[in-house]
Design a protein with these regions (language model features):
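Small-residue-enriched alpha-helical segments and adjacent helix-cap loops
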Residues: 20-165, 191, 289-431
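Active-site cores of enzymes that catalyze phosphoryl transfer or operate on phosphate-rich substrates
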Residues: 267-292, 297
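Intrinsic, low-complexity N-terminal interaction/targeting segments
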Residues: 2-16, 82-83, 274-277
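Mobile "lid/hinge" segments at catalytic clefts and subdomain interfaces of large enzymes
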Residues: 131, 135-223, 419-470, 474
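Gly-rich Lys/Arg/Thr-decorated short loops/hinges at beta-loop-alpha junctions or inter-strand turns
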Residues: 17-24, 174-176, 283-290
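Terminal amphipathic helices with adjacent charged low-complexity linkers/tails
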Residues: 68-69, 205-250, 269-278, 334-339
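Short, C-terminally biased terminal segments at protein or domain edges
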Residues: 250-268
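Long hydrophobic segments that form regular secondary structure
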Residues: 283-287, 297-318, 461, 467, ...
Length: 497
């Protein structure tokens, strides 16, 4: 065995889970090429696994491994760029891009070269291997499919065609990073990221002596305070006086200025399905196609098939999204119909109106020691029920609803989706059932009436969606509809016969 088992795994250091070993492959920028798809297909064949999963960081993970990846497999992964040559830094290559970087009609800055430069910086510095393997940096080019609301430690958001706004993770676990009143030119971004990562390293060396777990960036910032943290960063930058971090969200709460207005107009894509389906690119006569992977699962034949489609009809690129879906890009208009047919033949969905596009679920009791319920199975059961009984189409159809988000969590950690969903089902260890939260409101009309046994979930959620369709006011959001229902009314809706 060559690997030590880890809490947060990478290619070289798997984690022990209830269903076996868990390994994650970092995909910097979330973009795969055809050769990497071939390597993934071979990896699935070698390990005997049915599928690989796209994660909510736009990486890939393998579950239920019976042993560590051997040397030959790791060599194949490093040869094609799916693993780092230096095992010390493999796990910190969490680099998230806007999934439509370089092809988005509304994009302000193409962030791909900047992200590539950051990856080169990380992989050349073994000393940064001390950072948490959850450490992540996001690059948002200001296009229609944004990632500024994803819970990265650092995010750079393009605010015009020359500058980025710096965001840092300061809040609670799973919270989106916040602006810190620093604007950077393109050439200033890499030095700033380097200074922050080195300052984070110093903090780990200090706090890690007594910490029970490796400190996250937010822990280091909390220890020194935002001002103190920025002072150390400034020293790393040779004392640039204009880089003083401030909690800009707090300042905007008192009154917003021009900068706040500019950022307010940026499209946030929380649980956004807008990238699914066919979309025109910034390049003439080129389109991208967003494809649903139910619960992020991507089986061997689909890996092979999408790789062949990307090579034959696109530019060879397959883009992973933090919503656990896939984008095929650079397709000619004349080939769209054929590509859609090929995708359908692979058993995949390329529209935003399928129930599978609404669902997020953690590993649950089948794969995690903390899971109280089998979230994967229960989410699939709900998806099948909704698909058989409803047409979930936000553009029209038998049941017209805006895309909702439904989150199954086996415990209170919310690993699959850190931010609030429209409907959340929390695994309850005492009852092995689900506690239900709807738009932030829990059905508490009587003790334990907020608890749903797994077999009751599909009908209850179906009742709620149907009630929203039939009883809502014109243009009323799901959250507004559920907020104006009393606990008794919600209970009656959920448990209607």
């Amino acid at each position: 065995m060559i690997a030590e088992h880890a809490i947060c795994p990478d290619s070289y250091h798997p984690a022990v889970a209830r269903d076996g070993l868990l390994t994650r492959l970092r995909i910097p920028g979330g973009v795969l090429n055809v050769a990497q798809c071939v390597a993934i297909e071979q990896l699935l064949a070698t390990t005997g696994l049915d599928y690989i999963q796209v994660t909510n960081r736009a990486n890939l993970q393998l579950r239920a491994l019976t042993k560590d990846l051997d040397r030959d497999v790791l060599t194949a992964l490093t040869d094609c760029g799916l693993a780092a040559n230096d095992r010390a830094v493999d796990g910190i290559r969490n680099i998230m891009l806007s999934p439509t970087a370089g092809i988005d009609l509304q994009e302000l800055i193409d962030v791909r070269s900047l992200a590539a430069a950051w990856h080169d910086y990380l992989t050349d510095r073994s000393e940064l291997g001390i950072l948490s393997t959850k450490f992540s940096v996001g690059f948002d080019g200001g296009g229609s499919v944004g990632i500024v609301d994803r819970p990265n430690d650092i995010t750079l958001l393009a605010v015009n065609d020359r500058e980025f706004e710096l965001y840092l993770s300061i809040g609670n676990r799973g919270s989106a990073p916040i602006p810190v009143d620093v604007r950077l030119g393109v050439d200033e971004c890499l030095p700033m990221l380097a200074a922050i990562s080195q300052t984070y390293r110093y903090g780990i060396e200090l706090l890690g002596r007594t910490a029970r777990r490796k400190p996250r960036l937010r822990d280091v910032i909390e220890h020194w305070g935002l001002t103190g943290f920025s002072e150390i960063v400034r020293r790393e930058l040779a004392g640039s006086s204009r880089f003083i971090f401030k909690n800009l969200d707090e300042q905007r709460g008192a009154g917003s200025g021009e900068r706040g207005t500019e950022l307010k107009n940026h499209t946030l894509n929380r649980d956004n399905n807008d990238h699914l389906g066919i979309h025109q690119q910034s390049q003439p006569d080129r389109y991208y196609l967003g494809i649903v992977l139910p619960l992020g699962r991507w089986n061997r034949s689909q890996v092979k098939g999408l790789g062949e489609i990307a090579e034959g009809y696109g530019s060879g690129a397959i883009r992973l999204t933090p919503w656990q879906n896939i984008i095929l890009s650079d397709i000619k208009s004349a080939d769209l119909e054929r590509v859609q047919l090929l995708i359908t033949e692979l058993g995949l969905i390329h529209t935003a109106n399928h129930p599978s596009s609404l669902l997020r679920a953690c590993a649950g009791s089948s794969g995690c020691q903390f899971g109280a319920t089998d979230t994967q199975r229960d989410a699939i059961d709900l998806s099948n029920y909704l698909a058989a009984n409803f047409t979930l189409d936000h553009l029209g159809g038998a049941l017209r609803v805006r895309p909702l988000s439904i989150h199954f969590s086996g415990c209170d950690k919310s690993c699959a989706q850190h931010d609030r969903a429209d409907i959340t089902l929390w695994g309850d260890e005492r009852t092995r059932s689900y506690r239900l939260a709807i738009g932030g409101i829990t059905d508490r009309s009587e003790p334990d009436q907020s608890v749903l046994a797994p077999p009751a979930v599909p009908i209850a959620i179906g009742n709620l969606i149907a009630a929203y369709h039939h009883q809502r006011h014109p243009q009323e959001s799901f959250e507004s509809f559920t907020t104006r229902q009393s606990p008794v009314q919600l209970h009656q809706i959920l448990h209607a016969v």
